[in-house]
Amino acid sequence: MTLQSLVIQLGAASESTIPTTLSRAIHAQVMQWLSLGDAQIATAVHDSQESPLSLSGLIGYRRKQGIQLGDDFAVRISLLDSNLIQPLLQGIESSHNKSIYLGKCPFVIRSIYSLPGTHALVNSSDYTILVNTSQVSNDITLQFLSPTSFKQNQNIQPFPLPDLVFNSLLRRWNRFAPAELQFPQVEWQGLVSAFELKTHALKMEAGAEIGTVGWVKYRFSDPEQARIATILANFAVFSGVGRKTAMGMGQVNSKLRIKN
């Protein structure tokens, strides 16, 4: 099963003012592309309780006076299910010469980057490669690139506690990885050894979502937990972590310190 992150480069098709967030508009556009490629798969994704998509917000420089014709932007789309790759690319290709609208702002598709090495944000792997990693780290740093939060009981928790982060990743891994590669439930014993975080409000159509951005270093003294956490940290680059990862939240990068 392949994991894929691809980047769609967009050009502004007119002068306009972009809303603070386009999370829902980007999600809707990706779903439309999927539907153009395979309506049945798009319906299954829409009805899924655990989204196989992780989406960035609109990446690019926003002028204070509004965007200008031709300004460059990008969207990163990560897929946790290899069955989505072909229909998504087919849907995007069918829109290649047409304007698309995000929050009433028109854009044209300039490029589609899907091969590693063609763009810094493009990545590819598979579940077998990740689970068979020979580089296990006891110290794992996760960088939270967009506001991140978690459900904790009936509340929303913005601080990325070890059990919330790695249970979120474990649940998503077990939902999409082949059965033979899935993990049992883990009673995490990891600790936060350092962090630099701030809260940030991501404006959504239904109101602001409060989440955390910054970095956290986690330490796992148990070798088996360190192994699983390393696998899940590498997976997080594709899956995101926490709530609303298909709406631009929980975008993650990871750094592992490998002991010699």
Language-model segments: residues:
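RNA-interacting cores
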Residues: 1-260
